């Protein structure tokens, strides 16, 4: 039985082409299409529910820099810092007052963060530890007045001495008081300078202060931010254009900010950091608007990574070098004067928060080496202080992330305020925070079995088809080669039979040398019948036929 070589060749070739086109072109497009239809912020969708009410808390860590030599620093000495932490909190995020705009394909919402102290994870710390930090009201207030309203320095100095009697440049207080419960601000004095100073509390300019009665306030770094509005966003839902999913369109009902000198720095780039569009390319980066910095930040691809056995991409970010990067000059106080730009690895938050604060990576990681040298007690390293995100591009899922940021006081001596007149000029770290998330198996399995299982099946199928098709192509090539290099055995047998038939009809030839033959051969008569005779009964004829057959 012969194998149909042509059919085998055509079938194997078709299988090979199908495996290539389906496995690398058609299936990925089908998968991306299915994901794009599922991953939207359309009301009623699973993604919308997870996005609006995160069903699990994020981990929020606070590390505080305790100043161990406050009196010496007040006289100009180099600060010695002791890192205390982490104080661990469960951070719950939810969005409320949602309003959809079907025509614009957007949804507006108010973001709310709630911090709940986790005593078990914080051990051995309890939150009642006493910390020494720069006075959070007196130092920023005095420095701001000196820079912006020097003519009011005498009035402010007198008011501070009344509101904070016997105050020093550094304040010793419990951690929970400094960050959540609040330190007391007494505005009960009727003295003009004190009343003038307290005006900023009554008008709400000091956002970290909470009024408890007509004459007293409580100031804390994060107390007012706990379980309260952190801004109103308007973002794209991604129904009409999935590539715009989560893109910030407005913040505080404004299409752009009015904070920085240049319009480019005031634009919103990226999402609200709680959702990302699927199908991103690794070189696109992960951009998000951060209200705490009044700025959009972009994480860039670093290397491949994995999470619970699933492949992902590792992204990282830093604050860059504003002075060296022309695109970032709009974050300088004066874009035309580079001397007003902050040092490498830092960002001036004065325009954003209204005080002499600087943002940086923890321990000034990736910052100007001078920043680290100006104080004792810092040890910047990638493992503990870098920002990272392990991200799955096709589904737009962040598997794990750690967003880290340090807040520093841009400190300088203040001549008009006695406790501050000898302070050194430097950027003093106060505390840094980490907002982290690690998806558990409940949520990673959703990605694993809806995305990676399909990809695995497709991979097995396409490579199996390619293997079978290559085997078929090689076997058909072998058959074609065998056909051209050898003769078919049946054809050989048929040719031999034809030769035998032809040979049986031919007469023997006379010997070329009569001397070598002792037999006399009779003369062959023509094969015709003589009239009146029958060769079957003619003895002579019969004798001749028998004689010929013997030869």
UniProtKB/Swiss-Prot annotation:
| Organism encoding this protein | Drosophila melanogaster
Segments carrying the region annotation (Disordered) are: 503-551
- Membrane topology reported for the UniProt record: Multi-pass membrane protein
Q: Would you identify the family this protein belongs to, as annotated?
A: Belongs to the CD36 family.
- TM helices/strands, residue ranges: 8-28, 460-480
Pfam families linked: CD36
**Which InterPro entries does the record match to this protein?**
CD36/SCARB1/SNMP1 (IPR005428), CD36_fam (IPR002159)
Q: What is this protein called?
A: Sensory neuron membrane protein 1
- Summarize what gene deletion causes: Mutants are viable and fertile with no gross morphological or locomotor defects.
Membrane-side (Cytoplasmic) residue stretches: 1-7, 481-551
Q: In which tissues is it expressed?
A: Selectively expressed in antenna. Expressed in lateral-distal population of OSNs that coexpress Orco, in non-neuronal support cells that surround these OSNs, in support cells elsewhere in the antenna and chemosensory organs on the proboscis. Expressed in trichoid sensory cilia (at protein level).
Q: Which domain of life is it from?
A: Eukaryota
Give Gene Ontology CC terms: cilium; dendrite; membrane; neuronal cell body; plasma membrane
* Ranges of the Extracellular topological domain: 29-459
Q: Where in the cell is it found?
A: Cell membrane
Q: Please name every pair of cysteines joined by a disulfide bond in this record.
A: 265-330, 294-352, 332-341
Q: In Gene Ontology terms, what is one molecular function of this protein?
A: scavenger receptor activity
Q: Which UniProt keywords apply?
A: Cell membrane, Disulfide bond, Glycoprotein, Membrane, Olfaction, Receptor, Sensory transduction, Transmembrane, Transmembrane helix
């Amino acid at each position: 039985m012969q194998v149909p070589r042509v059919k085998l060749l055509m079938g194997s070739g078709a299988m090979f082409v199908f495996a290539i086109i389906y496995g690398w072109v058609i299936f990925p497009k089908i998968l991306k299409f299915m994901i794009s239809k599922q991953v939207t912020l359309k009301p009623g969708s699973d993604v919308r529910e997870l996005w609006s009410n995160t069903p699990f808390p994020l981990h929020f860590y606070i590390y505080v820099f305790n100043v161990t030599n406050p009196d010496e620093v007040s006289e100009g000495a180099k600060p010695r810092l002791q890192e205390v932490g982490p104080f661990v909190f469960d951070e719950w995020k939810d969005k409320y007052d949602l309003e959809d705009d079907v025509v614009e394909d957007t949804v507006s919402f108010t973001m709310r963060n709630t911090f709940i102290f986790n005593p078990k994870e914080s051990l051995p710390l309890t939150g009642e530890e006493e910390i020494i930090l720069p006075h959070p009201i007196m130092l920023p207030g005095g420095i701001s007045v000196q820079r912006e309203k020097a003519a009011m320095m005498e009035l402010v100095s007198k008011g501070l001495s009344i509101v904070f009697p016997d105050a020093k440049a550094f304040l010793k207080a419990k951690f929970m008081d400094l960050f959540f419960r609040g330190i007391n601000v007494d505005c009960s004095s009727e003295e003009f300078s004190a009343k003038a100073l307290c005006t900023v509390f009554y008008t709400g300019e000091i956002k970290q202060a909470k009024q408890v009665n007509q004459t007293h306030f409580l100031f804390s770094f994060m107390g007012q931010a706990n379980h309260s509005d952190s801004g109103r966003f308007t973002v794209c839902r991604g129904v009409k254009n999935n590539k715009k999913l989560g893109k910030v369109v407005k913040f505080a009902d404004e299409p752009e900010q009015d904070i920085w000198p240049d319009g480019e720095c005031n634009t919103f780039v990226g999402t609200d950091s709680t959702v990302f569009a699927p199908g991103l390319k690794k070189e696109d980066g992960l951009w998000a608007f951060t209200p705490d910095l009044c700025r959009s930040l972009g994480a860039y691809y670093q290397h491949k990574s994995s999470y619970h056995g699933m492949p992902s991409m590792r992204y990282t970010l830093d604050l860059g070098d504003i002075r060296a990067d022309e695109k970032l000059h709009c974050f300088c106080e004066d874009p035309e004067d580079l001397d007003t730009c902050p040092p490498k690895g830092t960002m001036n938050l004065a325009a954003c928060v209204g005080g002499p604060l600087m943002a940086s990576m923890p321990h000034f990681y990736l910052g100007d080496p001078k920043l680290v040298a100006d104080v004792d007690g810092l040890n910047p390293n990638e493992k503990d202080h870098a920002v990272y995100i392990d991200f799955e591009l096709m589904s737009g899922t962040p598997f794990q992330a750690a967003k880290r940021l340090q807040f520093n006081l841009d400190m300088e001596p203040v001549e008009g305020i006695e406790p501050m007149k000898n302070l050194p000029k430097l950027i003093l770290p106060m505390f840094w925070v980490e907002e982290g998330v690690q998806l558990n198996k409940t949520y990673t399995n959703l990605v694993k079995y809806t995305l990676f299982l399909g990809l695995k099946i497709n991979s097995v199928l396409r490579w199996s088809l390619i293997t079978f098709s290559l085997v078929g192509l090689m076997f058909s090539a072998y058959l074609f080669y065998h056909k051209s290099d050898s003769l078919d055995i049946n054809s050989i047998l048929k040719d031999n039979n034809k030769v035998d038939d032809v040979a049986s009809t031919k007469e023997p030839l006379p010997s070329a040398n009569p001397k070598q033959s002792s037999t006399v051969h009779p003369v062959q008569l023509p094969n015709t019948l003589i009239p009146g005779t029958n060769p079957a009964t003619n003895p002579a004829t019969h004798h001749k036929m028998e004689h010929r057959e013997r030869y």
